[in-house]
């Protein structure tokens, strides 16, 4: 919306005196900064009201796993969930205000984010109303997520309009691209669905998921800005995708809304993100990675999410095949709890890992 302010000076000559000041709204970097501040302020201001409303409507709050760490039954009992509504509200408001409303990439990523958020919201709703961990049926949920992701990937491929839009770039190599053709739509959907569920599995401790999400968002905000700039992408020899620079504004909105949410999610949490937030944010990261052609880099920067997801897959596969469990409990953050690590130790150490992985992922932009 603010992007159009500069157009007012062209439409109304009497406003041309403000052209110098309003010209800053042309710059993605300025609008990204504005999106960060707006997203954070929105959640800061409306967060307490949303939390009170959710606590009143949910009563007992999110059901706590009885087979998990016993400390959670006491410390987390009665805490409301669906905190992702705070993040999504701040994200949408900030993006609408600061992003170019004519950019199709922004709307595609927003559609995936809200679509996954709706699936997560329904899952949270079922869990809260039934006071059970069996929410939305797993297969049905995955089918809906896959449908959303397939439509989004098809739209992204159509926007690309060149052979490289259906290829997979390999980090550290200048011209190595695996060509999928139209099968890339399926691969891209797998990336989006996988990212959504990986972040969902990570969200198990206060503050554990939101900070790595913010780190990944900041990293992909930079990648989107560079990939959407012809000069920078040519210098770094990365795939140029015209128009994706605007996704940096959306990433800024996520960063700001995430900061606001962390204020209330810091231990002891006043609210949980829930599937509403974790699925939405994971789907967002996956769709941005597909849009800017850095799918493998997402697996590096979001390596913590991959670790959490793999720990669950390995645990389930091992138990079904051998009857034995590899970890004391999965996802892996609960394994460390069982080993005696405190919740703050796990959360902060995982944050540190996320920062290190982000630096490694960003280094792939130059090391080719």
Swiss-Prot record:
Q: What does this protein do?
A: Catalyzes the initial step of the lipid cycle reactions in the biosynthesis of the cell wall peptidoglycan: transfers peptidoglycan precursor phospho-MurNAc-pentapeptide from UDP-MurNAc-pentapeptide onto the lipid carrier undecaprenyl phosphate, yielding undecaprenyl-pyrophosphoryl-MurNAc-pentapeptide, known as lipid I.
Which Enzyme Commission numbers does its entry carry?
Answer: 2.7.8.13
An example GO biological process term is: cell division
Q: Which organism is it from?
A: Bradyrhizobium sp. (strain ORS 278)
Name the chain's protein. Answer: Phospho-N-acetylmuramoyl-pentapeptide-transferase
Q: Which cofactor does it need?
A: Mg(2+)
Q: Where in or outside the cell is it found?
A: Cell inner membrane
- Alphabetical list of PANTHER family matching this protein: PHOSPHO-N-ACETYLMURAMOYL-PENTAPEPTIDE-TRANSFERASE (PTHR22926), PHOSPHO-N-ACETYLMURAMOYL-PENTAPEPTIDE-TRANSFERASE HOMOLOG (PTHR22926:SF5)
- State a single Pfam family of this protein: MraY_sig1
* Pathway(s) where this gene product acts: Cell wall biogenesis; peptidoglycan biosynthesis
**Cellular component, GO, one term:** plasma membrane
Family statement drawn from the similarity comment of this UniProt entry:
Belongs to the glycosyltransferase 4 family. MraY subfamily.
Where does this chain mainly localize?
A: membrane
Please list the reactions this protein catalyses: UDP-N-acetyl-alpha-D-muramoyl-L-alanyl-gamma-D-glutamyl-meso-2,6-diaminopimeloyl-D-alanyl-D-alanine + di-trans,octa-cis-undecaprenyl phosphate = di-trans,octa-cis-undecaprenyl diphospho-N-acetyl-alpha-D-muramoyl-L-alanyl-D-glutamyl-meso-2,6-diaminopimeloyl-D-alanyl-D-alanine + UMP
What GO MF annotations does this protein's record show?
A: metal ion binding; phospho-N-acetylmuramoyl-pentapeptide-transferase activity; UDP-N-acetylmuramoyl-L-alanyl-D-glutamyl-meso-2,6-diaminopimelyl-D-alanyl-D-alanine:undecaprenyl-phosphate transferase activity
For membrane topology, the record states:
Multi-pass membrane protein
Transmembrane portions of the chain: 34-54, 79-99, 102-122, 140-160, 176-196, 207-227, 247-267, 271-291, 296-316, 345-365
Q: By its UniProt entry, which InterPro entries does this protein fall under?
A: Glycosyl_transferase_4, PNAcMuramoyl-5peptid_Trfase, PNAcMuramoyl-5peptid_Trfase_CS
Its ancestry begins with:
Bacteria, Pseudomonadati, Pseudomonadota, Alphaproteobacteria, Hyphomicrobiales
Q: Which UniProt keywords apply?
A: Cell cycle, Cell division, Cell inner membrane, Cell membrane, Cell shape, Cell wall biogenesis/degradation, Magnesium, Membrane, Metal-binding, Peptidoglycan synthesis, Transferase, Transmembrane, Transmembrane helix
What's the gene?
A: mraY
């Amino acid at each position: 919306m603010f992007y159009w302010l500069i157009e007012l000076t062209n439409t109304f000559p009497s406003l041309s005196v403000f052209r110098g000041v309003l010209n800053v709204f042309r710059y993605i970097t300025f609008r990204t900064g504005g999106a960060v501040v707006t997203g954070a302020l929105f959640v800061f201001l409306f967060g307490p009201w949303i939390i009170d409303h959710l606590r009143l409507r949910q009563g007992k709050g999110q059901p706590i796993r009885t087979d998990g760490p016993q400390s959670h039954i006491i410390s987390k009992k009665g805490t409301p969930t669906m905190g992702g509504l705070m993040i999504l509200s701040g994200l949408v408001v900030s993006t609408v205000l600061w992003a170019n409303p004519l950019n199709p990439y922004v709307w595609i990523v927003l559609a995936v984010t809200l679509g996954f958020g709706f699936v997560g919201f329904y899952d949270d709703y079922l869990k809260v109303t039934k006071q059970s961990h069996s929410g939305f049926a797993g297969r049905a949920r995955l089918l809906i997520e896959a449908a959303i992701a397939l439509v989004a990937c098809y739209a992204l491929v159509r926007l690309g309009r060149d052979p490289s839009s259906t290829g997979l770039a390999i980090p550290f190599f200048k011209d190595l691209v695996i060509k999928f053709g139209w099968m890339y739509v399926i691969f891209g959907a797998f990336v989006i669905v996988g990212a959504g569920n990986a972040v969902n599995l990570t969200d198990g401790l206060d503050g554990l998921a939101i900070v790595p999400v913010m780190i990944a968002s900041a990293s992909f905000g930079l990648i989107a800005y560079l990939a959407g700039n012809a000069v920078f992408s040519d210098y770094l020899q990365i795939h140029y995708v015209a128009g994706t620079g605007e996704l940096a504004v959306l990433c800024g909105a996520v960063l700001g809304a995430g900061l606001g949410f962390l204020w209330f999610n810091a231990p002891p949490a006043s609210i949980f993100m829930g599937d509403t937030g974790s699925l939405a944010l994971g789907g967002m990261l996956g769709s941005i990675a597909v849009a800017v052609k850095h799918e493998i880099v997402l697996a590096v920067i979001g390596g913590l999410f991959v670790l959490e997801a793999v720990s669950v897959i390995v645990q389930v596969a091992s138990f079904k095949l051998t009857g034995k469990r590899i970890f004391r409990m999965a996802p892996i953050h609960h394994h460390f709890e069982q080993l005696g690590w405190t919740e703050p130790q796990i959360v902060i150490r995982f944050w540190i890992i996320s920062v290190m992985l982000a630096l490694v992922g960003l280094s792939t932009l130059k090391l080719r």
